Amino acid sequence: MAAAEEPKPKKLKVEAPQALSENVLFGMGNPLLDISAVVDKDFLDKYSLKPNDQILAEEKHKELFDELVRKFKVEYHAGGSTQNSIKVAQWMIQKPHKAATFFGCIGIDKFGEILKSKAAEAHVDAHYYEQNEQPTGTCAACITGDNRSLVANLAAANCYKKEKHLDLENNWVLVEKARVYYIAGFFLTVSPESVLKVARYAAENNRIFTLNLSAPFISQFFKESLMEVMPYVDILFGNETEAATFAREQGFETKDIKEIAKKAQALAKVNSKRPRTVVFTQGRDDTVVATENEVMAFAVLDQNQKEIIDTNGAGDAFVGGFLSQLVYNKPLTECIRAGHYAASVIIRRTGCTFPEKPDFH
């Protein structure tokens, strides 16, 4: 009997993930408090918002935040695209706590305190640059059906300073500890020099640097910063709308998402040891992945439409799930599967929130 059971431990050994060290995953971005509500079309029209978009607040949106709170039933959630992804990754990883690090700028105020306590609850090692010139940033998530229109008032998030935070020895040490880096394209509007410093470090040390296209306006109005960092990007994330805008801005002359992924994959690259991978999600449609040799499509998990509560954060959650397996050097297919799993959990809840433990095997 004993002989027949012998191979078992061996099998377990192969599959048991290697123990992770703290701070193995590093993220940097705009920490925002999400103020989300289900709104009507009139509200979107009043502030000329598209149903499914991400924009930065302008003068004409000043009243929007007050009206949202006054007119609709709002929920407050700790948000910000990168911070969401980092939290989801930490949730999927579970142990050790503080496997994930997050940098960003907040104000010295109530909202800032909420973000700090929420990061601690999620076991993320958050190191915020705190300043009192601007209040903590907020993001209005205006939900209609399974669309969400995001209006970000960056405020404090916009005040992140490389020389005041990233460059400090006790902070930079955390960058050096990481093996995988993730920054949403949104942060290019705040501190492109911080993004570049981390990206260069990753390339020089053959570590994995990942970036998200984040929103159509990044490819349009922050093209220079985006393309300056692109040669350092090992894994590029985005959704179908962002991919289409990126392709148009780059003169790819195709609207086919697989072709776009292929062309983005082939853009110039600094660290030739790591060919780029491009991952484009498309809501309920297949996720498209381009590697050096092929373009593949992966079906998302079947979801009962009635169970979908809030698609805000689905893209962030996908990235978080993906990163949670990437830190273990799992194959691409496993990273995608984890991404799809995490997104499927998040869309059944309000905000980018999750149950106590994941059920991913």
Curated annotation (Swiss-Prot):
A motif (Nuclear localization signal) lies at residues 7-15. Its cofactor is Mg(2+). The gene is ADK. Mg(2+) 1 binds at S48. It is found in: Nucleus. Binds 3 Mg(2+) ions per subunit. Keywords: ATP-binding, Kinase, Magnesium, Metal-binding, Nucleotide-binding, Nucleus, Phosphoprotein, Purine salvage, Transferase. Adenosine binds at D34, Q305. The modification Phosphotyrosine is found at Y76. Activity is inhibited by 5-iodotubercidin and 5'-amino-5'-deoxyadenosine. One of its GO terms (biological process) is dAMP salvage. Its main location: nucleus. Pathway: Purine metabolism; AMP biosynthesis via salvage pathway; AMP from adenosine: step 1/1. Signal peptide: none annotated. It catalyses: adenosine + ATP = AMP + ADP + H(+). Belongs to the carbohydrate kinase PfkB family. The N-terminus is blocked. InterPro entries: Adenokinase, Carboh/pur_kinase_PfkB_CS, PfkB_dom, Ribokinase-like. It is an enzyme of class 2 (transferase). The active site is at D316, D316 (proton acceptor). GO terms for cellular component: cytosol; nucleoplasm; plasma membrane. This is Adenosine kinase. Mg(2+) 2 binds at D146, N147. Catalyzes the phosphorylation of the purine nucleoside adenosine at the 5' position in an ATP-dependent manner. Serves as a potential regulator of concentrations of extracellular adenosine and intracellular adenine nucleotides. PROSITE patterns: PFKB_KINASES_2 (PS00584). Its EC number is 2.7.1.20.
